[in-house]
Amino acid sequence: SGGFDFSFLPQPPQEKAVGLGPGPMGLMGPRGPPGASGAPGPQGFQGPAGEPGEPGQTGPAGARGPAGPPGKAGGVVGPQGARGFPGTPGLPGFKGIRGHNGLDGLKGEPGAPGENGTPGQTGARGLPGERGRVGAPGPAGRGSDGSVGPVGPAGPIGSAGPPGFPGAPGPKGELGPVGNTGPAGPAGPRGEQGLPGVSGPVGPPGNPGANGLTGAKGAAGLPGVAGAPGLPGPRGIPGPVGASGATGARGLVGEPGPAGSKGESGGKGEPGSAGPQGPPGSSGEEGKRGPNGEGSTGPTGPPGLRGGPGSRGLPGADGRAGVIGLAGARGASGPAGVRGPSGDTGRPGEPGLMGARGLPGSPGNVGPAGKEGPVGLPGIDGRPGPIGPAGARGEAGNIGFPGPKGPAGDPGKGNRGAPGPDGNNGAQGPPGLQGVQGGKGEQGPAGPPGFQGLPGPAGTTGEAGKPGERGPGEFGLPGPAGPRGERGPPGESGAVGPSGAIGSRGPSGPPGPDGNKGEPGVVGAPGTAGPAGSGGLPGERGAAGIPGGKGEKGETGLRGEVGTTGRDGARGAPGAVGAPGPAGATGDRGEAGAAGPAGPAGPRGSPGERGEVGPAGPNGFAGPAGAAGQPGAKGERGTKGPKGENGIVGPTGPVGSAGPAGPNGPAGPAGSRGDGGPPGVTGFPGAAGRTGPPGPSGITGPPGPPGAAGKEGLRGPRGDQGPVGRGETGAGGPPGFTGEKGPSGEPGTAGPPGTAGPQGLLGAPGILGLPGSRGERGLPGVAGAVGEPGPLGISGPPGARGGKHGNRGEPGPVGSVGPVGALGPRGPSGPQGIRGDKGEPGEKGPRGLPGLKGHNGLQGLPGLAGQHGDQGSPGPVGPAGPRGPAGPSGPPGKDGRTGHPGAVGPAGIRGSQGSQGPSGPAGPPGPPGPPGASGGGYDFGYEGDFYRA
């Protein structure tokens, strides 16, 4: 009933009873006082193993005990070390001459087993073992009189005690026996193609084989791989600058008309369409990163609620204008893009406020006279009279239509006019059409190495280790498995490993928000245009100036209608071919493309003559660098040293070669997230990784069409002669009919023996005649010609049965042997007989000489690609491997497509007004606008040139 049997324990000695019968049972007296505690009894025998009790509740977590001493290195042989990084591929050797096919060598004996590798490093500390079982109950106590007290009821299960202190590390385990050799692992990845071997010596010429039959012509080979695209040719020499066009005749100034009344202000016009996009400007150099600030990083607070957008602050005071940088030398002009179609002309905007009248500039030099214009129409008054005195200057008339643009004059040297008031910002026009992408710029020098990136997020929790071996219980009996203990605190951070190689450049960060628009600069008075100078030689590119603040983004205007596409201009003459440029760096080899579907077999062509062996081709591209190997074994945790003082920041030294990857230390506690650093410089694209393991085999596709018959190979050696069959004798055919005997012919000359006629049926035996007397031997007559067999006669009726045969006569003399007759024609084949029993195998003949190795057959067309198998479940995330060395710099990639415009960020702090940059080059003249309404503005002009405000 769940109790224990203590009958095996020693019982107290019983006093000998008197031989009387049992008396009556007395009344039970009152319970006496408890006796004094007796001396502790001797140690009882170990009781039987108790039944396992119910698992106790998990007690509160005890205080963290002191760190135990580091465990001793275990003697278990560690796993096989990770595969080392692949060495740099050697230069491919020269292609050797193809030697004759040698004889197959004998199979070699298997090599001796390799030596055991060095034992691996100590593995990580295992999880604590299972909880021991409840021990057996102790011996029963004894009273003062030595009697065994009654066994009390089972007490309630006590609460679990506090967790015990970690035990001392166990003794060093002994080195276990050498395990059995494991099964052969899966085939490793295909090794890299070795260098071609040295050509072997030319073997002796073989025996000339028999001329084989001419084989059928093989199918046409697959088309070769397309060669790599050639290097881009050098840039052509720019052509000469075209001559300036002829200057048109200057229009006649009409007489000034009366001043009209000032009209009402027109409504705000719709924004005009944007002009064609200008060529892209040169990229500025990236600024240097400032020094890191001091101070320790505080703990990361909880993320606050996102506040609403604050009110826009007052614009700050304008900062001091920065120093204008030196004007950079003009870079090389990029190829001119194709001019986009002209958009529809937008309505003119509202006229701005008229600025203060500027001081008149000094008159410029007189430009060269243009060609004489056409003769105007004769005036109403006939021939002009003599010139009278100059009258008073009349009012300015309306501005006539603009005449053709004359050549630019020299720039005026007058003082700069006073700045006019700021005009209102016009509405922003619609975005212009995207210009043609400019030519690819030259690759700049490699930038400085980027700063070390922020530490990545903590990896996923690794799988729990296997439980340790069950330890001995207190009383030698293993207890039941207790609940799994809580995960221990993370260990201390290991010693910092050596700095890894510089990582690849990270992706460019998103563009920051646009700053506030600076105040517009003072608009100067328009100077007179000078003559166009000859195009100078392009100067060297100077350092980029300090970029000015970016203005606020205006409201998006209405998009104008798309204009009609203009006709393409005439194609210019091709420029002179420049000298070839230096060869570019060798790019990485691209991945092999997927095999295309098998095409139909082409027609069989005529065999061409074998060409001469060409020269050895250039060396191929170097293969891609292999992927990083498996992570190394975990190193032992070093002691944490004291933090040193911050030293003086020295100059940046040269980038050293990548050192060996150190072992990964134990995972430290997750630190607080630091402030976001500036986006790192985009690194160079890394080398293509090694091809992954082959995926599961797809479903076998339908068989492809049969390929063309390959060329017939050389005739192989003759095989051993098979056993000779012994057929059974076929059944005899039916006997033929007996022909009639023809008349005896005259003996003629001996002709060739004729073909034997069919055997006739045996006639009925004739009447037995009497034996005649033996005649004399006559002379042999001349053999007559064998007559043709006559037609088969009708078989006569069977004759009467004759008597018995007479006595056999004596044999006649043997005649002379006649001449051998000619071989008659082959008779018809008889019916096939029954197959005879298999004969005994004959003796094995001698082995024939090995035949020459046949040519390799043409490679069959690739079969249809099988269906793609289902994607397997993702495996567990492995530990991060060591950072591999930086791969070689790949070729510059093609310019990517223009990304979608990002969302407009919040308005930044208004920047200080930048200094006025140098004047940009004059843009192309825009299309003439429609004539505006005649307003009542102020008219002023100089030397007959009128301007209307």
From Swiss-Prot:
- Annotated localization: Secreted; Secreted, Extracellular space; Secreted, Extracellular space, Extracellular matrix
Q: Where is this region: Disordered?
A: 1-949
Query: 5-hydroxylysine is carried by which residues?
Result: K95
Q: Which keywords fit this entry according to its UniProt record?
A: Extinct organism protein, Extracellular matrix, Glycoprotein, Hydroxylation, Secreted
A single cellular component GO annotation = extracellular space
Residues carrying a glycan: K95
Query: How does it get modified after it is made?
Result: Prolines at the third position of the tripeptide repeating unit (G-X-Y) are hydroxylated in some or all of the chains.
Q: 4-hydroxyproline modification sites?
A: P10, P13, P34, P40, P348, P351
Return the Basic and acidic residues bias intervals: 634-643, 835-846
Listed Pro residues bias regions: 921-931
Give the Gly residues compositional bias ranges: 263-272, 292-313, 435-444, 530-539, 671-680, 722-736
**According to the lineage, what is the superkingdom?**
Eukaryota
- The biased composition feature labelled Low complexity covers 27-66, 147-162, 208-229, 273-283, 377-396, 490-507, 519-529, 562-606, 613-633, 651-661, 682-691, 737-771, 779-792, 810-825
Tissue-specific expression: Expressed in bones.
How does it associate, per the subunit comment?
Trimers of one alpha 2(I) and two alpha 1(I) chains. Interacts (via C-terminus) with TMEM131 (via PapD-L domain); the interaction is direct and is involved in assembly and TRAPPIII ER-to-Golgi transport complex-dependent secretion of collagen.
Query: What does the UniProt record say this protein does?
Result: Type I collagen is a member of group I collagen (fibrillar forming collagen).
Q: What else is known?
A: These protein fragments were extracted from an ancient mandible bone collected in Haiti.
What is stated as this protein's family in its record?
Answer: Belongs to the fibrillar collagen family.
PANTHER family per record:
COLLAGEN ALPHA, COLLAGEN TRIPLE HELIX REPEAT
Q: State what protein this is by name.
A: Collagen alpha-2(I) chain
